[in-house]
């Protein structure tokens, strides 16, 4: 316990690389000097090298990841796979080699009756040892042994590999400035000069300044490869100013393959990514080392977050909030990087962003529920049964983009909290409270975990205004109250909003009950003409308040979401279809996302297949452009002329389905 703070640093400790590399060099030199190739512990590819590989990862990451602080080599190799620091096949190769080397070691010691790891040189002893280990002869034993040692040697060569080729200065400072002269204007040169002459840089320790000078030529080399080098460099300078105060980040850039190139590419592609990293430089490590070849599944995200939450104590609310925030931010950044580099399909990106939110929500509810139950116990259900931790009488419902599985990079979460507890009965813990108080505190605690603003930002903005009675209503509603409100008091626009809802997490019974209520409300018999008129009137109000101004429209500006022919028109048509047609076609309530809703309407014969396909294509194109603009930090406006065909397709269907009197679009 006394040595732990010295062995395991609190954050990822890249500064130990130089020491580890030196230690590795000492091991290699000792092998050559002492000619210990026949020593299966100290020789090349031996037991010591496997242990060194494990200890390298423990020293670098063990301060932040408690599960890596074990002493069993084989268990730690498995943990390195769980922590995604080693690939499964790498760990398996090392484990197999370790077990075989230990078998050989035990055979040597049993035959010699002494503590030695030296292979026998006498042919008689060699033959005997081969027989003991189950081999036909010494040659067969050595073939297997050398294969295992070669595997170990390869992994040993890769760990903290000599980066002199990476860390060498590509050019001296004058040569770098010459390269920059060709791409920087006068203002750019002044900003670079101001950076290098800043008081902040002057105050840096000499070691940190030298690291910055090592990073700089590689950074410029990468910057010169992108389309807009000056803009990219101006985005990177604020990040360098932030991270040079903790030179461990500079070491990380020097130590990670391709880290500088990825950082430059992402900064060139998205000012949003650059600004996120400037605001939260702690994300840099995860961002530059995360896998972006494939988008993660929800199961992978959940397992990752579970592992991270195991690093903090159950009572450490601040630590839990920090992990939720940084997990969300780092995973969203990874999706953005994957999106930009691999041009992911829109729906795959939205799925990934939605899964991140779901995993964070599920964890927040789990943490909040466990904390409350430990203090107050569990409430009773409305039917008198006792709720359980695995099946609480509480659920979180997602509305809007979360409900529709259509989250973007900056989306907030529209949430409604529902319960099925006996509001008057007390919980069964040492400090009992009423069921209603329990649910209110649970919802508030979930909100706290998600929305508390700290130096690391917040996990999500949360909007609960869509709950029954809006701001005037209770933060948590019972299933009974929710049903009564939807049946007797809700406006049509609230039923529209119900189209894009789904249960996110909580007790299975409550989630199933919500699904049933949603289905029954959406399939109520309605006058299609009245629905059409209310949808038209609501959409007109939105356009007047949120759409482009008259002058902007005359200037040929098209707002992708709010103007005629935009995303909201398509969403309103889908919602109209559910409200007007699901009474006769109850399967239209199966899904909450627009793409599958339109497909179901075509299947039911409510829309022609060609109309549904046209709306789907327009919807995906327009939403994909909003994602691109969000990453570029640009407004959601485009040239009306360039989007003329798409707008006309949507507007023609709007006229046919909702508003025959709608004015034609300006060509």
Pin down the residues of each PLM region.
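A nucleotide- and high-energy phosphate-metabolite-utilizing enzyme signature
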Residues: 1-667
